[in-house]
């Protein structure tokens, strides 16, 4: 009975000490921002919440972006990192709870005395253990906060990569469409220059113009024709860039019919000025990394003090 009272006193004392922990919460620094920002309109909706590439009404681009987000190697690595941080966070939470262990032993002996064997009955034993670390100085709580901050930082890093991939894919696609249109213009120009060369040749042979005009038409045709290989190479490189972003081998990229007469919305929502920085995933990631660093400091400080672990076997 006395031992039980001592054990209860130890538990009560441990809980009292743990409630008087030395840990401090992280606080956001003062940024000294202006009281107001002059802006045209305030809207809680922001274009970051919209599938802005759908404004172009290009289903091919939408499919390409979805495929890129699904197959991009860096995006897959970021998603795997999120799962890793999530599991580590679960481990940090579980460390605050008691641990239960069990061991099973089996023994069987056979002795041989001058050719006569004597066997003993098998012996079995089971041992159970219970361990619990009392979080006196907040080390385990700091570990939980550190795991949560690292998990949230990995989520924001994936969001930043997703936004970057969407922007890079859309820009590369529009550049590819622009190169296609430029090549089409050059081909039409070459066709026109070929007709001009034929007309200049007929005029020269008929004595209507000098040879200089005929040679000038040939020079203009050669100049326009020289642009075709350069544009074809740029198109191939741009297709390779899009294929790499989509996690595929270099191949032909499907194009949609790009409408130059796009109907844009009258107002593109930019969101509330007070939340613009808070919505940026790189800023949010940096904030969570700061929280994780502060938690690591708390863990290191708490490790300076002795730990109390209760073990029962």
What are these regions (language model features)?
Residues 41-67:
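Regulatory alphaC helix of protein kinase catalytic domains
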Residues 136-143:
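Short, polar/flexible loop-turn hinges at active-site or ligand-entry regions and domain interfaces
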């Amino acid at each position: 009975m006395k031992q039980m009272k001592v054990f209860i006193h130890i538990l009560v004392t441990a809980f009292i000490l743990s409630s008087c922990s030395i840990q401090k919460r992280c606080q956001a620094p003062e940024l000294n921002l202006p009281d107001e920002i002059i802006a045209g309109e305030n809207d809680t909706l922001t274009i970051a919440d919209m599938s802005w590439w759908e404004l172009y009404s290009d289903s091919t681009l939408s499919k390409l972006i979805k495929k890129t987000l699904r197959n991009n190697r860096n995006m897959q690595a970021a998603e795997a990192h999120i799962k890793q941080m999530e599991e580590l966070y679960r481990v940090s939470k579980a460390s605050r709870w008691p641990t239960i262990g069990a061991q099973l032993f089996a023994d069987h002996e056979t002795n041989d005395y001058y050719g006569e064997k004597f066997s003993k009955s098998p012996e079995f034993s089971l041992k159970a253990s219970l361990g619990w670390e009392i979080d006196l100085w907040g080390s385990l709580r700091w570990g939980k906060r550190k795991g949560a901050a690292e998990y949230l930082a990995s989520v924001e890093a994936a969001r930043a990569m997703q936004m970057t991939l969407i922007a890079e894919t859309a820009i590369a696609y529009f550049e590819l469409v622009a190169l296609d249109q430029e090549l089409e213009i050059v081909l039409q120009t070459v066709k026109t220059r070929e007709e001009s060369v034929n007309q200049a040749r007929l005029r020269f042979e008929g004595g209507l113009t000098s040879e200089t005009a005929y040679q000038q038409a040939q020079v203009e045709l050669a100049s326009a024709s020289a642009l075709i290989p350069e544009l074809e190479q740029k198109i191939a490189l741009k297709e390779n860039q899009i294929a790499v972003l989509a996690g595929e081998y270099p191949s032909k990229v499907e194009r949609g019919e790009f409408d130059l007469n796009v109907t844009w919305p009258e107002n593109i929502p930019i969101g509330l000025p007070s939340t613009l920085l808070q919505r940026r995933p790189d800023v949010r990631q940096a904030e969570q990394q700061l929280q994780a660093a502060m938690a690591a400091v708390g863990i290191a400080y708490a490790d300076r003090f002795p730990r109390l672990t209760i073990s029962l076997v």
